[in-house]
Amino acid sequence: PEKERFSSLVADQLQMKHLNRSEAGLSNDGILRKTIKYCEKEPVDFAVIQFTKYSRREILNIKKPLPDTSPYLRINAGNPSKGVKEYFAKLSTPEDDIANFYKNKFLIEFYLTAKKIPFYFLQLSKKIKRGVATDRWLYHKSAWDEDYFANYRSSWQKYGDNNKPVDCIYQILGGDEDSGSPYFTSSKRPHPNAEGHRKIADHILKKL
């Protein structure tokens, strides 16, 4: 339920109105674009940005008829098209994913700072365990134990606060559904349960 989401819990505690702009399957490129588009039109007192998996990407699909709600082709595990499979199998690299993450983080940070909008960042990326089928590894079988943020660097990290780690949802919740954390639903696509959202909200409130 919406009232149990961490965004609602934080807003209720602060006695503020809020708008949850989350969108399933959106890439960090899309999060950057939507954030700027909204902030250019509406007054914002505070922004909590949750970055998604760094392997999610998007490209402008010029063949898609306009106007359309989203002329962007989403490149993620939820899109099983041939082009997406080819991208993950032959083009995607951890170096490029990390560079793109830090680029988007820097641009959102720069924009919000220029607009004098206070912000707090979270992210969803986590250490990949051997054999886990997630995005790239759905189509490319060379999975291995990997901590992307520790092992891959980007020139974008020189800018802004990019050398400071972004708090990860899975760290806040003490792991993920596979490691036995009690803060997730038991569905095929696990998400934080009510207790998990409460824990995330408490973490954000401590950071404000």
Task: Give residue spans per PLM region.
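Serine-esterase "nucleophile elbow" of acetyl-processing enzymes
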Residues: 1-30, 36, 40-41, 192, ...
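Alpha-helical cap/lid subdomain in secreted, periplasmic
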Residues: 36-208
